[in-house]
Curated annotation (Swiss-Prot):
Originating gene: clpS
Species this chain originates from: Helicobacter pylori (strain ATCC 700392 / 26695)
A Pfam family that the UniProt record links to this protein: ClpS
Gene Ontology terms describing biological process: protein catabolic process; proteolysis
Role: Involved in the modulation of the specificity of the ClpAP-mediated ATP-dependent protein degradation.
InterPro entries the record matches: ClpS, ClpS_core, Ribosomal_bL12_C/ClpS-like
Assembly with partners or alone: Binds to the N-terminal domain of the chaperone ClpA.
Family: Belongs to the ClpS family.
HAMAP family with a match to the protein in the record: ClpS (MF_00302)
Protein name: ATP-dependent Clp protease adapter protein ClpS
Gene3D superfamilies in alphabetical order: 3.30.1390.10
Length: 91
């Protein structure tokens, strides 16, 4: 059997930044729908983001992190929320 050298994907974290306009309900919903958080995890992370100014939603292969962040940005924009998400490569 031939062995292939498959490179390890570059990993990235999605960071959600707190703002005074985006609702708590939207943040909890986004964390549950796009980042697969349980209700309890989403509530705890939402509180942490509000308290600390930002929080890590998850760590994924870079392309998946970019897509998840884009989906949430699009949903927020459609609802006229200024939610900011960052995708930071993990080295």
């Amino acid at each position: 059997m031939k062995m292939y050298n498959i490179p390890t994907p570059t990993m990235a974290q999605v960071i959600m930044v707190d703002d005074p306009i985006t609702t708590t309900e939207f943040v909890i919903s986004a964390l549950r729908d796009f980042f697969d958080k349980s209700l309890e995890e989403a509530k705890a992370l939402t509180s942490s983001i509000h308290r600390d100014g930002e929080g890590v939603c998850g760590v994924y292969p870079y392309d998946i992190a970019r897509h998840r962040a884009a989906w949430v940005r699009d949903k927020a924009k459609a609802l006229e929320f200024p939610l900011k998400l960052l995708v930071e490569e993990i080295k």
